[in-house]
């Protein structure tokens, strides 16, 4: 089951995984886009319109996927949005929406599938997080906070599920050409084509890795930022906004 499957990373994963023979429950709010993907994979998927912010809708969606396709072996929590704003112009409602979709939406998705996975003693939960989870970035307060929360949430879930047969994989990609990054004028370092990013994500899922970050060049820089003195990191980050 893939959330946020109508475009970007979610769509790319759906097409790739379906080509490998899997049956998919594709969730998003835009039915027409989901229907296009279902048509492209020739019946190996069903489209389910659902809003990840609605816990009951997510439970109903998971029930439908199980009824039509059988037990859910994997959840890919991909649904997410971003926002770009200096804190002085930040709209609290926009912040709430980002947190609601990126974090609570993932929690609702997990709650809809994990009890059955634990009962069966097998399954995999995958979170599509971001390198933005590691440290704050300029004009990205809501997005960075949501991805940091998402990564920590799934890390805690992984610890809770230790020994149950349910694995947890957290993906931390850098900049990828998707609708989320389209239209930005700022140069995004190591910007990846979607077709190059999808195999890396699928490989990590297949190997059931606990966590993966890519591209390695940008991941190395970001991790180095964790070791920098705060004054140094702030000086560098303030001069590099990727949200323009």
Locations of the language-model features?
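Conserved glycine-rich cofactor-binding loop
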Residues: 6-7
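Conserved glycine-rich Rossmann-like NAD(P)H-binding loop of the short-chain dehydrogenase/reductase
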Residues: 22-37
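The beta1-alpha1 cofactor-binding region of Rossmann-like NAD(H)/NADP(H)-dependent oxidoreductases
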Residues: 49-60, 92
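Substrate-binding pocket helix/loop in short-chain dehydrogenase/reductase
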Residues: 86-87, 91-99
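Active-site helix of classical SDR
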Residues: 110, 146
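Residue(s) in the substrate-gating loop at a strand-loop-helix junction
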Residues: 130
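C-terminal helical subdomain
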Residues: 170, 186-221
